[in-house]
Amino acid sequence: MLQLIRACIHDKKSLLQFGPTAPKYAEVINVQTADIETQLTMPIRRSASGLIMPEDWCPVVESLSNNQKISYCIKHWRDGLSWEKSGAIDFHMKAIQVNGRIDHCRTRADVDQRLSRLDKIWQLAERTQKLKQKREVSPFSFREYGGILVHIDGQGNPIFGLGGQHRLAIALTVGLRSFPAQL
């Protein structure tokens, strides 16, 4: 319900300010996988989805290769290492120790279940050569809210917004040409 309220407010403001081609809140866009090379160093909240930034907006970015979650996923899915040897278990357990939870996980059993679910999603993506949009996964999803978060810089290049890291890792390791993303 909150997403719907945010969308109505955002979409109406954008329509009035920028016209009918303005981006919508949590709008789904199709991104070419090969075009994603950088990520933000600090996340921007998903609630800022669809905002048009000033022309001189210059976020601090770094190489996607610096992303720990994507790195351990590549080690697991592409290089064949176990989740344990890829560093995924240690990464999650340290985050749980510091923050109490990560990715809805609070225990080692939760982490194991999550990684098992990710393996199933990866297998489906490999078999079908696509990632499902959020609405295909859950009928209660609003647009692409919760998907791979992507921002577009002033030159039209996509920047990974640090949301949907495992899904992006799936797109990269399966070799998908493109994937759905939340703008």
Residues of each region from the PLM?
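Long, acidic/serine-threonine-rich intrinsically disordered regions with weak helical/coil propensity
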Residues: 24-31, 35-36, 48, 60
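Extended, charge-rich helix/loop segments that form flexible
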Residues: 50-111
